[in-house]
Swiss-Prot record:
This is Transcription antitermination protein NusB. Keywords: RNA-binding, Transcription, Transcription antitermination, Transcription regulation. The gene is nusB. GO terms for cellular component: cytosol. It comes from Mycobacterium leprae (strain TN). Pfam families: NusB (PF01029). Involved in transcription antitermination. Required for transcription of ribosomal RNA (rRNA) genes. Binds specifically to the boxA antiterminator sequence of the ribosomal RNA (rrn) operons. NCBIfam families: nusB (TIGR01951). One of its GO terms (biological process) is DNA-templated transcription termination. HAMAP family: NusB.
Length: 190
């Protein structure tokens, strides 16, 4: 039986690799996913991407501008393009999880990012990643609340009279794969 926590960790690591590769090759993450998927279909010895890797890479690709804006707003004495490329990829994955992954508790997203920084980057990176993500975590509730308000306003303008904002549907590979609460999906609106 496979360990879902280790599976998610490896999927995150592969998402970081994929984002790093996309940036290095000046391609979009979606193009890399497409190439990897085609390769896995055509060659028996090439494993397909983990579904969570695809979900994360697609999510980061869709929200890169907002994610990078958050990173930039919390950098002190640094510019985004001066960060090590692997640190940018790690931060993008983690911030995507903080903002958009309903089934990943915030402390898990940060801890995973720090672990990836220990595995993949410089000696200074884990502390840097932890510090920056700690600052981002302070504003994520406001960001999620603002997103909910916008969604509710759109619904009201469309004539829907619901009093609550439904959670977004978990993307493929997300449902039931929580890292910390026995596989149950967190009931936090994000």
């Amino acid at each position: 039986m496979s360990n879902p926590v280790k599976g998610r960790h490896q999927a995150r690591k592969r998402a970081v690799d994929l984002l790093f590769e996309a940036e290095a090759r000046d391609l979009s993450p979606l193009e890399i996913i497409e190439v990897r998927s085609a390769l896995a279909k055509s060659k028996l010895d090439v494993a397909p991407l983990h579904p969570y890797t695809v979900v994360v890479a697609q999510g980061v690709s869709e929200h890169t501008a907002r994610i990078d804006e958050l990173i930039i707003s919390h950098l002190q004495g640094w510019k985004l393009d001066r960060l090590p490329a692997v640190d940018r990829a790690i931060l993008r994955v983690s911030i995507w999880e903080l903002l958009y992954a309903d089934d990943v508790p915030e402390p898990v997203a940060v801890d995973e990012a720090v672990e990836l920084a220990k595995e993949l980057s410089t000696d200074d990176s884990p502390g840097f990643v932890n510090g920056l993500l700690g600052k981002v975590m302070l504003v994520t509730p406001q960001i999620r609340a603002a997103a909910q308000a916008v969604q509710q306003a759109v619904r009201m303008a469309a004539g829907t009279s619901e009093d609550h904002v439904p959670q977004r549907e978990p993307a493929a590979g997300q449902l039931g794969q929580d890292d910390s609460n026995g596989g149950q999906v967190a009931a936090v609106c994000r």
